[in-house]
Every structure is written in structure tokens, then in C-alpha cells.
Amino acid sequence: CSYCMSPNSKIDRKALVMRNNPIIYSVDSLSSLSVGNGGFAYTVDFTGLQTFPDKYKKGIPLGTQSQWGWHSFANDKNFRFEETLKEYDFGRGRKELYSVQFDEPGRQHEAANWFRINPHRLHLGIVGLELPEAKPEDVKNIRQMLNMWQGIITGNFNINNVSYEVKTTCHPNRDEIAIQIKAKGMKPAVNFRFPYPTGEHSDDACNWNADDKHATTVVRTTENSAVLKRELDSTVYFVQLQWENEAELKEKSTHYFVLQSAADQLNFTCCFSPTYPEDENSTTEQSIAAAADYWHRFWENGAAVDFSQCTDPRAKELERRVVLSQYLTAIQCSASTPPQETGLTYNSWYGKFHLEMIWWHQAHFALWNRPQMPEKTLPWYHKVEPVARAIAQRQGFDGVRWMKMTDPSGREAPSSVGSFLVWQQPHLIYLAELIYRANSQTDEQKKILNAYYPLVEETAEFMYSFASYDKEKDRYVLKGLIPAQETLKASETVNPPFELSYWHFAMETAQKWRERKGEKRVAEWDTLIHKLSPLAYNEEGLYLAAESAPQTYEDIRFTSDHMAVLGALGILPSNRLINETYMRNTLHWVWDNWNWDKTWGWDYPMTAMNATRLGEPEKAVSALLMDKRTNTYLTNGHNYQDERLRIYLPGNGGLLTAIALMCAGWDGCTTPNPGFPKDGRWDVKWENFSQMP
């Protein structure tokens, strides 16, 4: 799969990006646009600011979020994490302690809830036009564009006979927005409003009815700047405002400040920081230039794929999704902590992140030859390693057990589902391997090997100790877990197919890392690799949701949610556990019969990767563009799921990973563009992908 284009047909990357810039012409609560830098994002309405947050609350909320902005409500009842633990016996000769939710009212129920809700991610503040009398319906002549090539949103609109022109960008290296406003016949004003958190599962994190629970004070002012200090219980952060025209900042009411310009133009920057800001903000022009430079380099480096020569009518939409997904994951999924499923736009699961999703959020970066993006995040695993080791020890396992739903501290969020998942475990090994492969320089590879070898080793130690030896059948089994297909129960599940295949791949990869380090392979690990149970199937030659689910095809519970069996060959390379004929049979059955209404955004790229590895490119393309609700991609490129999850970044990341596989293939694949039909309609041009394993 070394297929690539000749040098004289280089992709025009600027044209590729620019033709897919989203343009907004109307008030639509699902068409918010964002600027960001990977660890901070600012989401705006059609005004280029957060002028009408209520209108967007149930759409894509107008968030200002960061990797560092977290808050906990006071723990008045002194809940201890130990109060969330419950004993389970999964037949491993001991009791194991898991952090779970409790249905029955009482202290344990309250403790579990407290640890689920806290800490939660903060909305750092609304920055909007001050238009007290205006309503969204009053707006005319909207034309707003996100220029992804420069990382800037430009827009024009008319409200109450005043024409506005607004530019919005985010500094690439500071959590700072830069805004330029021109108003014909009006002196523009901007408001800065600060909410208290809600502690709700999925929302904009803005409680406007708790003014007495937090404080916003002006701690420094100059002629053209001010620093605001925010205090919410034990959380403190700062907001530094700097303006470039004659203007005055006034406190309108508690937590509500207005910057009023003296002329028809207002240029200002607003920097959010967890510590007192020692330096001045950049100027708006400096920020615009820094963002443009960053985004030019982003688009000029790494992989690119151009569908403009394809004659299949679906190609244009596929290209749009691919370009927008690169932008969205770059601004929201590349920080020093893992991303939440709704990124830095609005809270889902209280703003916490899910480690079983990190592969979907970040694997594509390495395959698109942007390994520096996940390299920002992986050091976090070092930081929380002691917490993960304590989980493994508490349950009687070796090594480290990576948590499922967590926060920057690595503390588990109690969950009666999440605490029993294990497919987050091998992700660390897979991501480290992809980063290693994406760096071709020996020195770089050595650095990566030294940095992540201890984590790879400890991750594999847990995986080995988690597998149970079945003496009677002389094999290793996986049990006492909830698989990626979460409709199965921990107490019943034995040998789910995706986890078996992942154990095989990750343990073999861990051995490879030992060899690269000059260490011997671990003999016991090799025994596990050779004696892992093959995937269970029925008499029709269809793979089961688990060996313990012989009734897979008679019970809708087993044919809903993620069709994780397809991930066993797709996300992962082929191995001795898999019979490709049975896998093909399973793909065809899933295609025709699955409960597609109960799927998630990454199920479509997972299906596409499975079809690609099975040599069914028409199915691969059709999977990516299947007309289902959870495969909807909005004007701004966000992957809409349902009323709760209006955006879903694992879907965007999965799409990019699937495209990498469909273009560049995998180790040993010799078919050019293996994921695209050879019918003359898919003349796909690409550059600089890495192959998948």
C-alpha cells in the first residue's frame, strides 16, 4: 500500500481546505462554530460571539472550555471514595472491589453521585455582544464563514438597522480569544458574564441563579486592560481583558461586565488562565497572524486526501466531513489531558473524559502523520499511573488498570457499567505503537520507546493477570467484564470477540516493545497469546456477541449498540483467532439486520474498516455515508447523535482513522486505495498517510 501520487500531481491543500469552509446564512442552533487550540475552545453563534446563548442551549451550546477549568461542589457530608466500592465475585478465587452506582437511597447512593458529578468541567465565561433589546429573530443578512485555512471566523449581519462585521480567532499557544468588531452607525459593546456550574450530566454548565455562590472581582485595571478574578468554592481562575480602541469597562451587575467602545470599532482580546496573568495579552493582529501561521503549518504538514477527481456523487460530502473532522479534532482533542466526548464545546458526563474513547479521538492523528497531537496527551498516563496501579491492586491484579470515566486526577467515576469495561486498557499500547511508527527517525523512536516502555509493560502485566486460565480446555478466557458492546452483563459475559482480538494484538505488541528495548519476550505472555480462545461462532458461521451469548441472533439486546465483533478485524489486524469467512458472514448479517437505530457515530467507521480489510470497498464507502441519525454530520462538521449528544467527536476521529486505512491500507496490504471501489468513480488522491498495523 505504498500507493501515492507522483510529485507533479501534488494536492493543492489550500484549495482543498477552503472549498470545505462552512458558511452560515441563518440562525440555526446546531450550526455554532468554534475556534480553539487543542486545549481551549470558544464556540460562537452567528454574531461571531456568544450573544444569544439561550437560543443555542439545546443545540450546540456556546461554550468557553479548557483542559484546566474544573470545579467541585463542597463535600459537606465528607463522602469517601471507599463508600462507592462494592464486592463482586467473578470466579477468580477472590472478591474484587468495583466503584459502582447504588439504586437504593442512602449514603452510598449519595457518595457515588457526588464522585460522578465532581469534579466537573467549567464554562469559563460568556463573551457576547451587548444588545439588551435584540432577539435572534431581529437579525438579517447573515453571512458567516469559518476559514479553516487561517483558523478565523468572519461574519457580517444586520441587527436593528446596524451592520456588523466581526472577526473571531483563538491564539494557538494561549487560552486567548481575539475579536475585531466594526459596527456601522453604532458604538459596539461587549459583555462578559460568568455563571456558576450546574453539575448536570449534559448541558452548557451555566447556572445563572446562584450569584451568591461565587465571586468575580476586578483585581487590576489600566487604561486599556483589566484582570478579573473568579472564585468558585475552591476553584480560582483569571480573565485578562485588553482593548485597542478607546473603551470603558463597567460592572453592570454581579458577574456581568460591559466593555463599551467610544467609536464604531472595538478590537479586544480575552485570555483565560488558571494563574494570575503576568504577561500582557497579544494584540488582535498578533493573534490573527499567530493563528494563521499555526493553521497553515497544520494543513501543509501531515496527510491530505483529495476527492475532487472522484465522479461518485457521494465523494463531495465525504471530503467535507473529512476536512471538517480534522479541524474539529485539532481544536478540541489535543491537550495535556484526554478529550471528553463533546470536546471543549459543552459538557457530557459532567465534562469528564472516557478512556475507552481516546483511541477514537486520537489514533487518526498518528496515522495522518501528526503524532505530536497525541504526544501532548500520553504523558498524562504517567501522572495517573499510581491511581491505576491502586485500582489493579484493589481488585487483585498485577500492573495498572486504566480507569474508564475520569478527570485530570485520574480518579474513577463510579459506574455500574464503566467500572467493568476493559477495552480502554490496550489503547495505551496501540497509541504508543502508532506514535512510534509515525516517527521514522531512530532518535525519535528511541525517545518514544524510553518514554512509554514502562507504561506498555505495566499495561500488559494487568492484561496477562486479567485473563483466566481454563484448565479443562487448556485455553485463556476473558470474563467478569462488560465488553465494548455494553448491552452485555459483567456477571454473564465470557470471551467477547473484540476484547479477545485486542488482547492478542496488544500482548504481541508489548512483546515487540520488549524486543526493541533489547529485553527477552516474557514466556508466560507468549503462552497467553498462543492459548487465547478463538472467537465463538454459531452453526451458521456467524460470530457471537460473546461465547456466553449463543442466542446472539435471536435477542435484540445482542444486535443493538456497538457491533463490536466487527472491530475484532478492522480496528485490529487479522490474527489466528479470526476466521475471515465467518467474519464476512457476520459483516453481511450486521449490514442487513443490525438494530442501526441504536448505534453510535464510530460504529460506521468501524464497519468501514472491517469491510476494507475483508476486501469489500463498496461496503466501506457505503458504511461511512449510511443515512442514519447517528451518522449525521452537521454544517459545522459535528457528528450529531441525539438530543443529548448533539456533537460526538469519537465519530469524527473514527472517520479519519477509517479514511487512513481505506487509502494507505495496513502492513502487508498491496492493493492501492483498498477501501475504495475500483469502478472508475473513486480517483482518490492522497499524501503522507501511515499504514495501520
Enumerate the language-model features and the residues they cover.
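Catalytic cores of secreted or luminal carbohydrate-active enzymes
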Residues: 109-138, 650-691
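Structural recognition of the beta-strand scaffold that forms the well-ordered cores
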Residues: 34, 41-44, 329, 372-376, ...
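Acidic/His metal-coordination segments adjacent to aromatic residues that form catalytic metal sites
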Residues: 338-352, 402-418, 479-496, 630-645
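Primarily short, surface-exposed interaction patches in extracytoplasmic proteins
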Residues: 306-315, 319, 337-351, 437-447, ...
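Acidic/histidine-rich catalytic neighborhood
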Residues: 458, 462-513
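Acidic/polar, glycine-enriched structural segments that form the non-catalytic walls/loops
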Residues: 4-352, 371, 381-389, 518
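Active-site core of glycosidic bond-cleaving carbohydrate-active enzymes
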Residues: 50, 54-55, 354-390, 408-411, ...
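A conserved hydrophobic secondary-structure block that centers on an alpha-helix together
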Residues: 159-167, 171-177, 198, 434, ...
